[in-house]
Amino acid sequence: MATPSNKNSKSHKRNRRGHIGLNVPNIVLDQTTGEYRVSHRVSPSGVYNGKQVIDKK
């Protein structure tokens, strides 16, 4: 197994891992129901882009 020949400092380690992080979900206000939902997803009522795509039972 490969091992580093020299010690990796905290700054080098953190610079390498800089792209790893939490992403904040893009939350928008649904115009049909008035509730918040994640964008580009079907709302809990089954409406997407102003059209009923899933029949709610």
From Swiss-Prot:
Region annotation (Disordered) ranges: 1-25
Any GO MF annotation of the entry: structural constituent of ribosome
GO BP terms: translation
Xref: SUPFAM superfamilies: Zn-binding ribosomal proteins
InterPro entries found in the cross-reference section: Ribosomal_bL32 (IPR002677), Ribosomal_bL32_bact (IPR044957), Ribosomal_zn-bd (IPR011332)
GO CC field: large ribosomal subunit
Compositionally biased spans, kind Basic residues: 9-19
Entry keyword set: Ribonucleoprotein, Ribosomal protein
Record-stated family: Belongs to the bacterial ribosomal protein bL32 family.
PANTHER family associated with the record: 50S RIBOSOMAL PROTEIN L32, LARGE RIBOSOMAL SUBUNIT PROTEIN BL32
Protein name as annotated: Large ribosomal subunit protein bL32
Organism of provenance: Leuconostoc mesenteroides subsp. mesenteroides (strain ATCC 8293 / DSM 20343 / BCRC 11652 / CCM 1803 / JCM 6124 / NCDO 523 / NBRC 100496 / NCIMB 8023 / NCTC 12954 / NRRL B-1118 / 37Y)
Lineage: Bacteria, Bacillati, Bacillota, Bacilli, Lactobacillales
